[in-house]
Every structure is written in C-alpha cells, then in structure tokens.
C-alpha cells in the first residue's frame, strides 16, 4: 500500500488532487464561485458589445448586382483554392489522420509542414468560407454555377476540418459561416448545424480512437466536461497566488522553435515547459509526463485558468475585467467592418475572432497577448490577408 506522503504525490501527479487544508479539494466551492464570476464578467462584455452593435446598426446589407458586380469567376477562384487546400491537407496530414494515427503524433512528425497545415485548417480555409458566405448570402441573384461552387467550398471545408484531426474542428471551421450569416438563417438551419457539429465530433472520435458510437458519445461528454476542466483545476491548485514567472508565457507567441533557438533550450525538455503553461500543467498533473515533454499531450486551460495563473485565486477578477474589455472591443470590431468597401478587412477580423479569440477562450497558451499577437499568429493572419487579396484581385470588391 502507498504511504500517506506517497499517496499525496501520486494524487498530485495522476489526477491533480491535492487536499491543502484537509477540508476541500482545490478549495472547490471557492473555485466554482470564482469561475462563475469570471463567466458573468465575460458575458457582460459580450452583452455590452451586442447593445453597441445593435445601436449603431453594424450589420450586412443586401447588395444589388447593379450596385456591386460580382463575377462568377470570383467564386470559381475561391472553389479552386479550396480544392487545393484539400489536396495539400491530405498529402501532408490527412492520410495519417484518416488511417487512425493520433493527432499529437501527427503534429510532432510532419516537421516543417506543421505550420502550413495549421494555417490551412485554422486560417486559410475558414477565411475562404467567411468570404464566400458573405458573397453568397448578400447578393440578390445566384446562378446555378455560383450555387454549385459555394457547395464545393463548403464540402472542402468539411474535408479539411476532418483531416485537421481535432474532434471539434468541423464546428470551429464553420464558426465564420455562422458569424457571417447567422442572422440570415432560419432557426431550423441553426439547429441542424448544431446537431451536425455534435454528430461530427462523435463520428471523428469513433475513427480516431477505434470506438463504437456509444463509446465515442460517452468519451466526448467526459472530454467536454470533466477532462476539459482538469487543466483549469490544476492551475487553481498549483498557483494559489499566481505565478511570479507568468511573464514567460508571453514568449510562446514567438513559436517553440524560435524560443528553443534564442534560449538554447531543447523544446522537448523539462526546462522548456516554463514557456508553455498547458504543457507544464500536463507534465505535473496528467500522468503522462513524457507526452507533455514531447508536446503530444496537452491539458486544456480556459481563460479562467489564465486569470488564476496571472493573478491568483484572490485577484483573478482583474484579468477577467481585462478579458471582458478585449472581448467587447473585438466583437464590435467584427461587426463594424461589415461594409462592402471593407470586405477584405472584415474577413480578416472575422477569422481573427473565430480562430484566435474564441479558441483562446476555450484553450489558452498562458497569455492572450502571445496568443493573439504572437509571431506565428501574425504570420498566419498576414498569410490570410494575402490569400483573400489574391482571390479578390481584379474584382470591384477589392478597393
């Protein structure tokens, strides 16, 4: 049998449970209340943004073909690029994902192609979907050719999302579509999207983990509830007063390889983990220390976990207020660019919101600044800008 001390160590390493004061695990009641307060503060930011957007009337308006001529070749170009993305994703990553190789192993094995597959899955393809959705839903007349090409773009989006490997990738891929045309769609279509997204998560889980349908449903419920909260629980336990070295997470925005070069630290070493909060917490608590070192396993840490990481249990709300303000400004920014003359800017901002902002709320790297404005994020956004500029080249939309 394990001794009492050994038992405590085992609990900390494997399941992240530490009874600090013999009264509560993680200070559970305080944790739940703090998390609820954090969520409420964030929702207030969104509510204020919605009120501002509605007051100013920041919405897309229908565009007559006579007012703004959109040639069919524009949709044809979007569809061609989307097909190329599918072929690229399959060649470098998709064939392994579809054959059942774990996503973490795929991510660590494709080397220099990794950033490009990430770009296609998280930025390039969502940008094409965002652009084509605006063009499709806010033009009065559609030809059969445009209808067919829009369907091709949507199908390509589904295929790229599946080959990205994540179970929620299809949902994340089509968030720009819902963002652009959500007010235009009838409720039954929105419900259909939610059901389709949930079903896709289950089906992808079946193929990835060789599970039955029922097993995949059960696992994904567990993954979306207990396991997704574990990283935040561990941050709450590990940093009751915040981490004095939290500023180190600012550097992760440079990218792991650049950090490794600048500081002469192997990115697959224990010493490197101080730069990556998710990998560090995974190393300490998850029970797969080598997986954390190799970068193939990560616990999810939410924006609330980031707030605790920086300010501790007592003053986390300072970060919550900052995050709510950031969310407020970005949300308004997305809708404020909904003008025909700002189409390029709107697509970039929309992808920034869905791929970076919403992604950060659910899974932080340790600092939203490095997540939003890190070197890799800026490169991806610049690549997206060049992509959409190329697609719009020669069109009256590109002003």
Describe the residue ranges of each PLM region.
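Hydrophobic cores of alpha-helical transmembrane segments in multi-pass inner/ER membrane proteins
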Residues: 37-57, 125-136, 176, 377-392
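Hydrophobic alpha-helical segments
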Residues: 299-399
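Membrane-interface segments at the starts/ends of alpha-helical transmembrane spans
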Residues: 19-37, 112-115
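Single conserved hydrophobic/aromatic residue that forms the stacking wall/gate
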Residues: 1-6, 10
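Small-residue-enriched transmembrane helix-hairpin modules in multi-pass membrane proteins
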Residues: 108-117, 205-323
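Membrane-embedded catalytic interface detector for glycan/lipid assembly enzymes
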Residues: 52-188, 197-214, 362, 369, ...
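Hydrophobic alpha-helical transmembrane segments
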Residues: 150-152, 171, 194, 317-318, ...
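Juxtamembrane "helix-exit" motif on the non-cytosolic side of transmembrane helices
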Residues: 14-26, 94-96, 360-364
């Amino acid at each position: 049998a394990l001794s009492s001390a050994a038992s405590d160590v085992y609990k900390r390493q494997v399941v992240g449970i530490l009874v600090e004061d013999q009264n509560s695990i993680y200070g559970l009641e305080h944790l739940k209340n703090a998390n609820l307060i954090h969520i409420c503060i964030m929702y207030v930011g969104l509510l204020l943004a919605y009120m501002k957007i509605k007051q100013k009337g920041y919405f897309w308006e229908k565009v007559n073909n006579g007012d703004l001529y959109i040639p069919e070749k524009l949709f044809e170009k979007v569809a061609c690029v989307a097909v190329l993305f599918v072929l690229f994703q399959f060649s470098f990553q998709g064939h392994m994902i579809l054959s059942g190789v774990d996503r973490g192993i795929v991510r660590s094995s494709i080397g220099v192609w990794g950033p490009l597959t990430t770009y296609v899955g998280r930025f390039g393809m969502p940008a094409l979907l965002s652009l084509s959705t605006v063009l499709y839903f806010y033009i009065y007349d559609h030809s059969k050719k445009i209808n067919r090409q829009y369907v091709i773009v949507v199908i390509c989006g589904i295929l790229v999302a599946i080959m990205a490997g994540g179970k929620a990738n299809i949902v994340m891929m089509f968030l720009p579509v819902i963002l652009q045309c959500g007010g235009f769609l009838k409720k039954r279509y929105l419900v259909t999207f939610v059901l389709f997204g949930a079903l896709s998560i289950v089906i992808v889980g079946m193929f990835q983990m060789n599970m039955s349908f029922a097993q995949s449903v059960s696992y994904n419920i567990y993954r979306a509830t207990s396991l997704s909260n574990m990283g935040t629980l561990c941050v709450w336990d590990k940093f009751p007063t915040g981490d004095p070295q939290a500023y180190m997470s600012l550097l992760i925005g440079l990218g792991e390889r650049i950090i490794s070069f600048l500081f002469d630290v192997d990115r697959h070493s224990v010493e490197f983990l101080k730069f990556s909060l998710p990998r560090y917490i995974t190393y300490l608590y998850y029970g797969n220390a080598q997986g954390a070192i190799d970068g193939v396993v990560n616990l999810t840490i939410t924006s609330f976990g980031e707030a605790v990481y920086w300010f501790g249990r007592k003053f986390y709300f300072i970060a919550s207020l900052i995050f709510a303000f950031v969310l407020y400004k970005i949300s308004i920014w997305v809708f404020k660019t909904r003008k025909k003359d700002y189409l390029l800017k709107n697509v970039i901002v929309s992808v920034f919101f869905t791929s970076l902002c919403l992604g950060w709320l659910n899974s932080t790297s340790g600092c939203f600044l490095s997540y939003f404005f890190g070197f890799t994020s800026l490169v991806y956004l610049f690549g997206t800008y060049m992509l959409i500029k190329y697609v719009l080249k020669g069109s009256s939309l590109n002003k």
